[in-house]
Regions:
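Long, hydrophobic N-terminal alpha-helical segment
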Residues: 1-44
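Helix-adjacent hinge/juxtasegments
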Residues: 49-86
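Glycine-rich, aromatic-bearing surface loops/beta-hairpins
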Residues: 106-147
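Short, charged/polar "capping" segments at the starts of alpha-helices
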Residues: 43-47, 117-119
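Conserved beta-strand elements of the Class I
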Residues: 36, 90-92, 109
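Short, solvent-exposed amphipathic alpha-helical segments in soluble enzyme
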Residues: 24-26, 52-55, 108-109, 125-128
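SF2 helicase motor core recognition
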Residues: 84-104
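Short His-Asn-centered micro-motif
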Residues: 38-40, 79-81, 92-95
Length: 147
């Protein structure tokens, strides 16, 4: 298996990490990708699950929490354990730690907001990815212009 492509989305102050995560999930789903969202905790997983139900009133992203729902699972699965099942396409890592299963994915997405804890943890992830010679892309996301 080829090394994963790594994408860091660096959010300016004023960009909500949870809302941006939902936006990325929605875009990837519409492009027919299958995603595994790795959360820091069960609470974060439940919060993201709830947010995806209300993120957009005009559309729906089929998703479930890992271990719940139908077999096969919908194209978007949210988990917090050290197991991503059979998902191989895109990993969105919302955890402060790097999951051991990241290598099974074609693409890994890391979302960096302005909190010191997230920035420090994801700097460590960046250094690790560099040490593995993974292809790394950085995307700066500007805050919406207030009118």
């Amino acid at each position: 298996m080829a090394d994963p492509r790594i994408d860091f989305y660096i959010l300016e102050a004023g960009v909500d990490r949870r809302q941006f995560t939902c936006q990325l999930i929605d875009q990837a789903y519409r492009r027919q990708h299958k995603l595994f969202i790795h959360c820091e905790s069960e609470q974060q997983a439940f919060e993201l699950d709830d947010l995806l139900w209300t993120y957009k009133t005009s559309s729906f992203v089929p998703h479930n929490l890992q271990g719940e729902g139908p077999t096969p699972p919908p194209p978007v699965q949210i988990g917090f354990s050290e197991n991503a099942g059979n998902f191989r396409d895109i990993l969105i890592n919302l955890s402060l730690s790097l999951p051991s299963f990241h290598r099974q994915f074609n693409r890994v997405i890391e979302i960096v907001d302005q909190s010191a804890e997230v920035k420090e943890a994801l700097r460590e992830h960046y250094r690790y990815y560099q040490s593995q010679s993974y292809q790394i892309n950085n995307h700066k996301i500007a805050a919406p212009v207030q009118s």
